[in-house]
């Protein structure tokens, strides 16, 4: 068996597990137009203060672009190499859903009245541009394309595997979750509920994407540890660890940027990692958020079969336990309405307004 070999027929599947992931993912389709946003507009204009709007604006500047870059990775880094129908179906489904995310985040920005110039403003901030520049270093696979499986070198195979770790493990699986955490503190406290619904559904998607692609990573590495030009497990491990550390560092710089305006406030006391009563950010501190992304990065490493490298203290468990259920559960309790957000189309009947207002 080989993930890199194509097949001239649809069935039998070589890797039915990837078809199953596609099937589950496609039953969870959604569109941004299904999310009511009128309360968010009122919150933005009348309920949020200047600090909160400024905080969210800094996040929004890179929010859409982050998923544009992830979607591009599926088309340029993954699909050119993996030809089997069940694998391309899974990847194609994931890539298509990134398009939904891009449109949803854009829908949010435009509903709030933000100008189109917002989409390019991230280029003015070193901390945001550095995140994009880093992943672009891994985006050029022209030296591999067209070689054919039999001509791939050890370095080529390690490049493919490291790219999956970077894009799916630490971009989708860690950096996006950092953004989700910063955004979710608002709907968890009664603000921006439409934004919260978009983020909640995106979490479901990105969890499936991360888990599906990391499973592919493990199968690919296992298949290529022997034979001609084998992957060197110790070399790949060190590469993945290096990527994890560098991407966590980039995300920490972004977190510092988002909180920079408030650096003189007590929430940024480097000696205090615990929640403080901050009325603008509901107790979320840069320290807790940085601990959280390290916690998430370790979980992604564990899923790949590697040991944790951050080993957080004083947080041996999730530093943001209020988000635990939203990130790890397949069906989430909607904190904003206390209703299920399992949005599988096969189980949805009637209009969305009827669903939201249905008695429990």
Curated annotation (Swiss-Prot):
Entry EC no(s): 1.17.4.1
Residues binding Fe cation 1: 67, 98, 101
Keyword tags: Deoxyribonucleotide synthesis, Iron, Metal-binding, Oxidoreductase
Names of required cofactors: Fe cation
Active-site residues (renumbered): 105
Function as written in the Swiss-Prot or TrEMBL entry: Ribonucleoside-diphosphate reductase holoenzyme provides the precursors necessary for viral DNA synthesis. Allows virus growth in non-dividing cells. Catalyzes the biosynthesis of deoxyribonucleotides from the corresponding ribonucleotides.
Name of the protein in question: Probable ribonucleoside-diphosphate reductase small subunit 376L
Native species: Invertebrate iridescent virus 6
